[in-house]
Amino acid sequence: MEMIKMKRFKTPISVLLLIQFVLLHLNISAQERLTLLGNRFLTFSTVVRVNQIETSRDQFHGTDESGIHSPEGARKFRETIENSWPGARITWSFSWLALKDQRPNYVDLRKLVVSYHKKYGDEITFLPGGYFANMYNTREQVNRDLHEGLQMVSEMVGGGYRPKSVIAGFLAAENQQYLAEKEGIHVCQGNIWSQYAVDNGDGEGSISYPYYPSREHFCKPAQGKKDMIDCVNLDGWTVDFLNARYPVPRFINGIRCGSRQGVGPIETILRQGTEIGTSEMLATTAAHFDTGFALNKFAWVTSIWEMSLVEAYKVYGYNGRNGLDGLEIWLKEIRRRWPQAKCITQGEFGMLWREQYKNNDSINYQFVQRGSGICGSEAEMEIKWFMNKDFRMALLRDWKANSPEKLIDFTRYDLKAVEPED
């Protein structure tokens, strides 16, 4: 009889211990769970393509880049990232032609990138129309390309894989709505902030941090529930706010200074050299990870680094540079100065933002940046940006001379906006 009592006593104790263990584990997991607020994020993406600008499935402009896409180049690129930031997760995007190409270098390259998904947790996704899909295709055609391109990515990776985001350069509101409602993808790099008179396409008037786009226009933050597309619209490159005032490249002290100067490689490391280039990249990063973090309670820096750049000096010159030395310096210095910063995929970041913000009502971004002294980022100038659902506004002043602030941009979002027709 006593033995029976002991057995009855032991069973409840073991259950209680199990419950205690589970609760402890859940508590630890909750503490470790990544949140948007309180963190600094870097999202780093790359593009695998065949031609410089692939305007449609079978048409393209610019240079044939097939000779500078190789598994060796991709391996060197990915190992540089892992050595500089162990555990970093990046996003790979493939163009239509890069998914279809059966030449050995592309077959092997696709296999290698799939192995990085398995090894590092990298995201693999699709790039429609070489950043400018809507300039060369109807919205209906872009939707077809998105559907079939994403299918090809899933088949390439296998195991029911599905990316959380798409890289698109610029993407019309209707196409972002299609992604959310038909493809179940709620994150899109569908906006290149303040890109004007650069490359083959423009997009001007948006805010630079994440937002839900309006059904009227991809650059306009949604004004309400009926207007909102449930697809987090992301910028492609974090730029120096001061340098971005200039619409076209200018030569300053013999250096070609582009308006896209910030953390992208072409306008910094490749044109200006490693020392000056990384100095600008870190100055732009600090504007977000220091002052921006204090103002917004989180910070985000993002860059798309085309895979072709690893060997692009063979075609475009770039003074013989591939930028990997600068990439290593930049990533290592970020980790040294902001050791708690997270490098996660574009899809992961967008979904964290989506968890925090259910609409645009409470977004209230503020930025303050003083010039780096490089190119158009004048050392004596200070710019302030205010960005929310209702408007964006920029104030400029000479902080060394303590001059009054000058209003240089005020864009209202309560006004109707219309995208160009197909």
Identify the residue ranges that each predicted region occupies:
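Active-site beta->alpha N-cap acidic-glycine motif
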Residues: E32-L112, K297-T302, L309-V310, M381-K389, ...
